[in-house]
């Protein structure tokens, strides 16, 4: 039985890694060994940051809501507590969008939250 060296498989695997490393700086997009390490590290960063992104957006929404709420003389925590007591079920993403785009509607929500707190 003849010996099989597997050259095509090896070349294909290496080409795939180099292709994934496209756009990397220096030898990281040309040398296989370094490219392989960087592609693995990039995957780790991507995995971590997909989770981080969710936290970052939530933080951003809360900051926006707090800024808009303070213009109406109420803190973020009191606003959220008031909305909960008024049984207004609206998520932070939508609330921040309303705060940015529709000040009238946000003012209405704030007034209902203030009423519920009394």
Swiss-Prot record:
UniProt-listed Pfam families: Ribosomal_L20 (PF00453)
GO biological process: ribosomal large subunit assembly; translation
Source organism, top-level taxon: Bacteria
InterPro entries for this protein: Ribosomal_bL20, RIBOSOMAL_L20_CS, Ribosomal_protein_bL20_C
Keyword Ribosomal protein on entry: yes
Keywords: Ribonucleoprotein, Ribosomal protein, RNA-binding, rRNA-binding
GO cellular component: ribonucleoprotein complex; ribosome
Keyword Ribonucleoprotein appears in the UniProt entry: yes
GO MF term list: rRNA binding; structural constituent of ribosome
UniProt family annotation: Belongs to the bacterial ribosomal protein bL20 family.
Biological role stated in the UniProt entry: Binds directly to 23S ribosomal RNA and is necessary for the in vitro assembly process of the 50S ribosomal subunit. It is not involved in the protein synthesizing functions of that subunit.
Annotated protein name in UniProt: Large ribosomal subunit protein bL20
Organism lineage: Bacteria, Bacillati, Bacillota, Bacilli, Bacillales
Gene from which the chain derives: rplT
